[in-house]
C-alpha cells in the first residue's frame, strides 16, 4: 500500500482540463465540448457521452463517479441502480428530482463485468 502522505505531496500534473472548457461556459457549450472530448482514452470504449441532466439552475447537485452500464446505454446519469436509490432518497426527503441536477465526474465510461480480483 502506498504511503498516503507521499501521494498527497506529489505535484499536480502540468496539464489541466482548462483548455477543453469552451469560452462562455454555458451548459450547452460544455455538453458539446464533452461530446467531442478526446483528452483521455475513456471515450474510446464508452457507448456515448453521459453528461448531466436536470434543472440547469438547480440548488441541489448530485455528482457520481462515473456512468454505470445502464447510464452508458441510455446516455443519461443515474438511471441504473444508483439512480433508483437516489430516487428513493429524494422521495423520502420530499425533493422532486426534476429540481435537482445529476452528473458524473467522468463523462465517458464503459462498464465491463470482471471476475474476482
What residue spans do the PLM features occupy?
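A polyanion-binding, active-site-adjacent surface
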Residues: 2-117
Amino acid at each position: 500500500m502506498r504511503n498516503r502522505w507521499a501521494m498527497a505531496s506529489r505535484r499536480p500534473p502540468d496539464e489541466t482540463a482548462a483548455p477543453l472548457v469552451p469560452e462562455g461556459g454555458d451548459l450547452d457549450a460544455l455538453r458539446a465540448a464533452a461530446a467531442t472530448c478526446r483528452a483521455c482514452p475513456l471515450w474510446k470504449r464508452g457507448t456515448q457521452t453521459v453528461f448531466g441532466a436536470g434543472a440547469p439552475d438547480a440548488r441541489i447537485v448530485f455528482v457520481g463517479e462515473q456512468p454505470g452500464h445502464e447510464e452508458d446505454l441510455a446516455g443519461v446519469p443515474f438511471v441504473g441502480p444508483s439512480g433508483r436509490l437516489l430516487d428513493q432518497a429524494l422521495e423520502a426527503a420530499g425533493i422532486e428530482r426534476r429540481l435537482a441536477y445529476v452528473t458524473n465526474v467522468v463523462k465517458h465510461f464503459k462498464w465491463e463485468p470482471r471476475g474476482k480480483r
